[in-house]
Curated annotation (Swiss-Prot):
Alphabetical list of HAMAP family matching this protein: Ribosomal_bS20 (MF_00500)
Family: Belongs to the bacterial ribosomal protein bS20 family.
Signal sequence coordinates: none
Keywords from the named record: Ribonucleoprotein, Ribosomal protein, RNA-binding, rRNA-binding
Transcription among keywords: no
GO annotation, biological process: translation
Lineage, opening ranks: Bacteria, Pseudomonadati, Pseudomonadota, Gammaproteobacteria, Cellvibrionales
Entry GO CC: cytosol; small ribosomal subunit
Natural source organism: Teredinibacter turnerae (strain ATCC 39867 / T7901)
Record protein name field: Small ribosomal subunit protein bS20
GO molecular function terms listed in the Swiss-Prot or TrEMBL record: small ribosomal subunit rRNA binding; structural constituent of ribosome
Length: 88
């Protein structure tokens, strides 16, 4: 339990940041799910559109430290490979 005023404020700030970061992580997962759903449906055009929409969001969250940059790169690489597999 935070006792000093400084520790109490930090605890409040941490709670606020945790809630905000959770919503941002959820947004990234939603964009990823849209791409995966289009891939599973076999719709290459929709998958490509969803991927193009997801990439800036993934990159932005990696820049902010919401997700690790390597995780962002891994997601983008795997999704792009799956989309290219649909077209072939």
């Amino acid at each position: 339990m935070a006792n000093s005023p400084q520790a109490k404020k930090r605890a409040r700030q941490n709670d606020k940041a945790r809630a905000h970061n959770a919503s941002l992580r959820s947004m990234v997962r939603t964009y990823l799910k849209k791409v995966v759903a289009a891939i599973e449906a076999g719709d290459a055009e929709a998958a490509k559109k969803a991927y193009v929409a997801a990439v800036p969001v993934i990159d932005r969250m990696a820049d902010k430290g919401i997700i690790h940059k390597n995780k962002a790169a891994r997601h983008k690489s795997r999704l792009n490979a799956q989309i290219k597999g649909l077209a072939a």
